[in-house]
Regions:
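Conserved helicase NTPase motor core
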Residues: 1, 5-10, 20, 39, ...
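Class I S-adenosyl-L-methionine
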Residues: 49-52, 56, 104, 161, ...
Length: 228
């Protein structure tokens, strides 16, 4: 029942963080906030569906229009509604399997056995993108035994970036990044996104990475954040 201002609720595992999100959404709607003006962000589709269902159990039809989604799904929906605004017109989204296939091809079958596998390369690439760390720092933290192969790994990742550009692909990390960049650099895009919401409710805030926070930070002056 706090007033309309940013809030961060700190709680340990098993303390009812999701229940708090449900209660907050129900309170806001009961207090007059239109349900479609609330966007809930969480980390799995299952939890997103569960939160909406639990709010509907409390409020019935008045919760119609409440939206809950993962960060990726939310960003994809924004891009699809305004692809030109995000510089993503005529791009295709690729999933993890597509990424693995590209890394397998670019790594090559005859590569040194010391070079990380396609799956490991994919994980290293994603970790660096989501944390903002350099390849050097990423390898030291996550794969020190592969550090001697840093130059080859860098070449594979540069080739992966080039292949995506050539084929007009967006992977899941690109989706977050392009939205975050536009929210930060384009007042028009930022205002367009912010105009759709009164509140952003973030579940499991402790699990957010720097890239996900870059999505929220530009909106903090126009949308009220409630993070648990």
């Amino acid at each position: 029942t706090i007033p309309r201002e940013h809030a961060l609720v700190l709680a340990g595992a098993g303390c009812g963080k999701t229940k708090t999100i449900v209660a907050r959404a129900a309170f806001l709607i009961s207090s007059g906030t239109p349900s479609h003006r609330i966007q809930i962000l969480t980390f799995t589709r299952r939890s997103a569906s569960e939160i909406v269902e639990r709010v509907r159990m409390h409020l019935g039809d008045s919760a119609e229009g409440l939206k809950a989604s993962t960060f990726h799904t939310w960003c994809i929906s924004l891009i699809r509604r305004a692809p030109a605004a995000f510089g993503c017109k005529d791009y295709s989204v690729i999933d993890r399997d597509d990424q693995l296939q590209l890394f397998k091809v670019l790594r090559g079958k005859k590569a040194s056995s010391q070079l990380p596998t396609a799956a490991q390369l994919c994980d290293l690439y994603s970790f660096a993108r989501n944390t903002g760390l350099t390849l050097d720092a990423t390898l030291k933290k996550n794969s020190p035994h592969s550090y001697s192969q840093k130059e080859q790994i860098a070449q594979v990742m540069l080739a992966y970036e080039a292949r995506k550009r050539d084929r007009r692909y967006l992977d899941y990390d690109d989706i977050l990044d392009v939205v975050a960049q536009q929210l930060s650099s384009s007042p028009n895009t930022r205002s367009w996104v912010a105009s759709q919401y009164d509140y952003l409710l973030v579940d499991e805030m402790q699990d957010t990475n720097p890239l996900q926070w870059k999505l929220l930070d530009p909106l903090k002056h126009q949308v009220t954040l409630f993070c648990v």
